Amino acid sequence: MVVPDLDDVTYDLEVDGEQVRRTLHRRVFERGGWATVAIAFEERASDGSWKPAKLALIRLQRVHEAWKKHAALTMAGTDALALGRALVEWGAAFDGNVDE
């Protein structure tokens, strides 16, 4: 995947005119020549209902005048929530307030 702008990174998917994956939330984290796009999404089950939400993390690198996909990771919603809770617990470390 190569896109000219980070706004062009999408995760929606249609098959034969039917939406089978839809984006619920999206956030871009950009620093220097690297960006991470976090996307909460749902996929359609075979019975037509929507499955529980998942998280996709897409890592992109700036190459000349475009963004090139470098890596991607998909997590179940429960795993994404567990990761979020862990990050909150570790918050002091990210703020530089770790007791030694």
What are these regions (language model features)?
Residues 1-100:
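Positively charged, low-complexity terminal tracts
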